[in-house]
Amino acid sequence: GTVPCGESCVFIPCITGIAGCSCKNKVCYLN
């Protein structure tokens, strides 16, 4: 929840989700 993964999740889920990233405020974050 604190480190940006450099990915947007406005239209599609976080591809970086496989690395532990999750969607928050339309941006993918790690932890």
From Swiss-Prot:
Keywords: Disulfide bond, Knottin, Plant defense. PROSITE patterns: CYCLOTIDE (PS51052), CYCLOTIDE_BRACELET (PS60008). It comes from the Eukaryota. Expressed in root nodules but not in seed. The keyword Disulfide bond applies. InterPro entries: Cyclotide, Cyclotide_bracelet_CS, Cyclotide_sf. Disulfide bonds join C5-C21, C9-C23, C14-C28. It holds the Pfam family Cyclotide. The keyword Cell inner membrane does not apply. There is a cross-link at G1-N31 (Cyclopeptide (Gly-Asn)). Contains 3 disulfide bonds. This is a cyclic peptide. SUPFAM superfamilies: Cyclotides (SSF57038). The presence of a 'disulfide through disulfide knot' structurally defines this protein as a knottin. Probably participates in a plant defense mechanism. This is Cliotide T17. It comes from Clitoria ternatea (Butterfly pea). The lineage of its organism: Eukaryota, Viridiplantae, Streptophyta, Embryophyta, Tracheophyta.
